[in-house]
Regions:
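Short, Lys/Arg-enriched N-terminal segments with co-localized hydrophobic residues
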Residues: 1-27
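Conserved phosphate-donor/acceptor-positioning beta-strand/loop module used by diverse small-molecule
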Residues: 139-161, 167-175
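Extreme N-terminal starter segment of soluble prokaryotic enzymes
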Residues: 29-32
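ATP-dependent small-molecule kinase phosphotransfer cores
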Residues: 68-125
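RNA pseudouridine synthases
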Residues: 120, 136-139
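Glycine-rich phosphate-binding P-loop
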Residues: 35-48
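Small-molecule kinase domains that catalyze NTP-dependent phosphoryl transfer to phosphate-bearing small molecules
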Residues: 86-93, 166-211
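Short beta-strand-centered segment that lines the nucleotide-binding/catalytic pocket of NTP-utilizing
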Residues: 57-68
Length: 222
């Protein structure tokens, strides 16, 4: 085990099954990376940059269209339901909006999302952002689960720049989004969101620069 920034650790089994990467012509094994992240930590940017350098698919909001096609719901509705809890209260989330079978619209979106994520993982190496992908692919031996987090001040600063917000509004946005992500994740997985035990690598973007985080993930493909 290697420790970086108190929470970065590796637990990697090297397997066969190699394919060719577009990055510097290196050889890499087929690998699926899931990235869960705190809002404002830069996890989306890191995942997107890794996918560009390796020339492999990157899935985040582009999953929404596939989920919408499976469920018949609008893309706007799926966007709201696929990663963020509609309520900030676990009790309300568990019981509101269910039909006589006990199923809610959120449950239908989650079921379709799970199927889409598993189908995408069968197509080859890729990066998947959020949406409980770490849980849905937890039994795949060729998959590594990353959690990206950061210090509050730096996350607030990043959110301010991205959305042109005041410090107060950026802080509120970060906390609200993370609370909804946590509730959604913990409701559907029965696991603690951000638990290092569920990830092979935890990256603190306040202690490690973006390039170093990207390089750590690239190493998983070699």
């Amino acid at each position: 085990m290697f420790l970086f920034s108190a929470r970065l650790c590796y637990n990697i089994d090297v397997e066969t099954g190699y394919s060719t990467s577009q990055e510097e012509g290196v050889t890499m094994k087929q690998t699926i990376i899931t990235i869960s992240r705190e809002f404002g930590s830069g996890g989306h940017f890191i995942g997107e940059e890794v996918s560009k350098r390796l020339g492999i698919p990157f899935y985040d909001k582009n999953i929404i269209q596939q989920i919408a096609e499976k469920t018949g719901f609008s893309e706007d509705f799926v966007k709201e339901q696929s990663e963020y809890a509609p309520s900030k209260n676990m009790f309300a989330y568990a019981f509101v909006g269910r039909d006589h079978t006990g199923s809610s619209l959120s449950d239908q979106v989650y079921a379709a999302q799970t199927q889409v994520i598993r189908n995408l993982s069968e197509k080859g190496s890729c990066i998947i952002i959020g949406r409980c992908a770490d849980y849905n692919l937890k039994d795949r031996p060729d998959t590594y689960h990353i959690f990206v987090y950061g210090d509050e001040y730096e996350k607030i600063s990043r959110t301010q720049q991205l959305f042109n917000l005041s410090e107060k509004d950026a802080r509120a946005m970060n906390r609200d989004m993370d609370k909804k992500r946590r509730l959604h994740y913990e409701y559907y997985t029965d696991r603690k969101w951000g638990d290092p035990g569920n990830h092979c690598m935890c990256l603190n973007t306040s202690a490690l620069d973006m390039e170093r985080c990207i390089r750590y993930i690239l190493d998983l493909f070699e």
